[in-house]
């Protein structure tokens, strides 16, 4: 049944390409890993609007970091949704790497845009701090009186530059006066804002025998997993919006406002959406759902990863699986650990 669902899914891909940020596909294309040495490849990246193409050619040395940023964003999405009905599945042989699932203005679309935008900002910022590009480096603006017992040192990561790159590149195609562009711009910025919110000081001690007479400190990004956890919380509390039309000098413009006035209005840190998500229980070529048949579920969980919810009430199958594992490990002085190899039997539960 899973293969049938995959076939149905592929049938709907052609409908997805028109409104897709298909440049995300550079995250899974090995041919883009050498962008820094082959600028002509900018023209081969699919789906670039003219502004993105100019940016790529002007700043080609940071384009590998842009590709890496989208890649880590996708990987983090798959981690955060690993136990949900929609698990951020990608299709490697398609330009629409998530399929039609992102055609709708749902919570899932909001999260993917936010995490991809954050990934680009994060990867570019980290690359600059590591000295991988000549056009950027460390942030030298965090100077002044730092505090008693420590001073500025090391390399503060320039998240403002990374966010600028993400904003100029990722938002370049979101300039239409419609609600979806407004939603994408907002969620892209929420992704970038998450990094700024989570920046923290890292310090290193200096002195005789580690006495820490003086500390040098610098601003650092968190692990990207922390950003993913933060944005997943924003996904769970995303604000539902409604579309309003206004007539301006340039014509009709669509904007978003909160659907419910008794809830707090979303800030620039929050995710927004205006269309309901499908239930993702069955394969559906129109929504891009793979369904949940044959997905591994947790028989002891009452949460969304549990067999009751993940399998959508269809029940589950159970099979036994033998695995080789290290066991009876003993530490020997000095200094190694010797283990035996054991065969252990596990129950594996999959959705019907």
Curated annotation (Swiss-Prot):
- Keywords from the UniProt entry: Cytoplasm, Developmental protein, Disulfide bond, Extracellular matrix, Glycoprotein, Lipoprotein, Secreted, Signal, Wnt signaling pathway
Span of the secretion signal? 1-18
Q: Which PROSITE patterns match?
A: WNT1
Species name = Gallus gallus
Give any single GO term for biological process: limb development
Residues the record marks as carrying a glycan? 87, 92, 298
Biological classification of the source: Eukaryota, Metazoa, Chordata, Craniata, Vertebrata
- What protein am I looking at? Protein Wnt-3a
Q: Which Pfam families match?
A: wnt
């Amino acid at each position: 049944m899973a293969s049938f669902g995959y076939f149905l899914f592929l049938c709907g891909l052609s409908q997805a390409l028109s409104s897709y940020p298909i440049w995300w596909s550079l995250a899974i294309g090995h041919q883009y890993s050498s962008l820094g040495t082959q600028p002509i490849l900018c023209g081969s990246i699919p789906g670039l609007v003219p502004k993105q193409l100019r940016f790529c050619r002007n700043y080609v040395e940071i384009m590998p970091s842009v590709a890496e940023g989208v890649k880590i964003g996708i990987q983090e999405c798959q981690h955060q949704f690993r136990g949900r009905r929609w698990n951020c599945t990608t299709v490697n042989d398609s330009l629409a790497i998530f399929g039609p699932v992102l055609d709708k203005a749902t919570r899932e679309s909001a999260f993917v845009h936010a995490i991809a935008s954050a990934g680009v900002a994060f990867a570019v910022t980290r690359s600059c701090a590591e000295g991988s590009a000549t056009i950027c480096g460390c942030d030298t603006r965090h100077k002044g009186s730092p505090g008693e017992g420590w001073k500025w040192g090391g390399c503060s990561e320039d998240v403002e530059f990374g966010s600028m790159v993400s904003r100029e590149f990722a938002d370049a195609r979101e300039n239409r006066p419609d609600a979806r562009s407004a939603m994408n711009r907002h969620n892209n910025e929420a992704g970038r804002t998450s990094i700024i919110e989570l920046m923290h000081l890292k310090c290193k001690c200096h002195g005789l025998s580690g006495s820490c007479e003086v500390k040098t400190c610098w601003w650092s990004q968190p692990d990207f997993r922390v950003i993913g956890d933060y944005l997943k919380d924003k996904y769970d509390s995303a604000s539902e919006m409604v579309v309003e039309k206004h007539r301006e000098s340039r014509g009709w413009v669509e904007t978003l406002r909160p659907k419910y006035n008794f809830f707090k209005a979303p800030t620039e840190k929050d995710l927004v959406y205006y269309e309901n998500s499908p239930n993702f229980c069955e394969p559906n070529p129109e929504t891009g759902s793979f369904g949940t048949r044959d997905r591994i579920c947790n028989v002891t969980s009452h949460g969304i990863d549990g067999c009751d919810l993940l399998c959508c009430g269809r029940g589950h199958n159970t099979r036994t699986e033998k695995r080789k594992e290290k066991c009876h490990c003993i530490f020997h002085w000095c200094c190694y650990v010797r283990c035996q190899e054991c065969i252990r039997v596990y129950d594996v539960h999959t959705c019907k």
